[in-house]
Amino acid sequence: MDNSKERLEVILDKLKEIEYGVAVIRSNEPQFPYTSGPRDYQIQAFENWKTNKQKGLFAMATGTGKTITSLNCLLEIYKRLGYYKALILVPTITLVDQWEKECAKFNFTNVIKVCSKYSGWQTSLANIRMLELTNPDNKQSYVIISTYASFIRPANFIELNQFPKNKLLFIADEAHNMGAGLIAKRLNDIKYSRRIGLSATPERQ
């Protein structure tokens, strides 16, 4: 994704806020960020995803709310279980920051950004991994946002591969990138029970 496309995504997000209406007054609880609630097609996307054993590809045009649609699925998980756990992969550092902002709109907290731009995330990941290993029934909520480049590095991959595959929602933005070389090989080694791919171009040439 080039810089011009990333800027377009930011502009479309701003227009989307206007279209949805005034944001919901914030509380400590995760919630949908707009008073109008999710659109019909976003509700249907969640229902289809749930029917398909919580697996699916959301192939949607730019500006139609792929990010909101996928985070709404995480919100529905929270409503049912009382906690949320997610690993989100994106192709660029700019999108790491953009996804963090979208998570904040839903009031998703404890966001860990895994990429070369930031430091300290190794300790945060290690602490959460230890909690998951020592207390598998914990209800600690967190969202890990990583670039594909950071995800496929051996040390990071080993760390992330120890997170609970049956409780964590895996979201791959620009999912057609997963068809590339080492990324595809790494993902073949991980079997997440809950998966969402996001793409405007699902067919890889």
Feature names for model-found ranges:
Residues 148-152, 158-204:
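SF2 helicase catalytic motif II
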Residues 94-125:
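Conserved helix-turn-beta segment of the N-terminal RecA-like "Helicase ATP-binding" lobe
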Residues 67-69, 82-106:
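Conserved Walker A/P-loop ATP-binding site and its immediately adjacent core
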Residues 136-155:
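Conserved two-lobed SF2 helicase motor
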Residues 1-22, 26:
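Accessory nucleic-acid engagement/destabilization modules that flank
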Residues 58, 143-146, 170:
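Hydrophobic positions in the central parallel beta-sheet of the AAA+
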Residues 52-75:
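Walker A/P-loop
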Residues 21-59:
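Conserved pre-motif I regulatory segment
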